[in-house]
Amino acid sequence: EDIYKINPKKLEPVDILVGGFPCQAFSVAGYRKGFKDPRGNLFYEIARFIDELKRKPKALMLENVKNLSSHDRGRTKKAIENILFDFGYYVHWQVYNTFKYTDIPQNRERTIITCFMNKNSYSYFLNNPIQKTSNLKPIASILQKKRINEKYYYFQDSQYYNMFKKEIKNRN
């Protein structure tokens, strides 16, 4: 549902609010219009949401592009921080690379803003860095070890070979 149409006062209290707002307004790949871009203003909808909930969440995690903290010479970061501080949050900004913390084989740096109402929770978070956990298995462990029946292969003498060869190279 469109966030503009949701009334936070009608929602049950939440302990943790996780969200993001469009990054195009802050990205070095975009025009970097920031809050002058309507998409950049969606942060203010998150702020409205927090403000109007029956009880402010105990913790927030917000995500955006790496460039967010340096956008507009740091003024964007300051504006966001001031709002979160006014709500009573302890605020921490950090850039994480998904490759370092996940099994995603891609270097993708993102700014993560973590906020806590409780100073002890905030301190605990800062003193216990996130560790990478991996559920990946070596590829050899999932490959089939027995010989595959030849009926599953298309050899050059197959009536479909040339068609498949052509389609595999087709960009459409």
Segments and roles (model prediction):
Residues 1-56, 65-78, 85:
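Core alpha/beta nucleotide-donor-binding catalytic domains of modification enzymes
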Residues 8, 83-87, 109-172:
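S-adenosyl-L-methionine-dependent DNA methyltransferase catalytic core
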Residues 8-11, 102-106:
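Short glycine-biased active-site loop of nucleotidyltransferases that positions the nucleotide triphosphate
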Residues 66-67, 98-101, 118-120:
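Short acidic/polar capping segments at secondary-structure boundaries
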Residues 59-65, 94:
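Short beta-strands and strand-loop turn motifs
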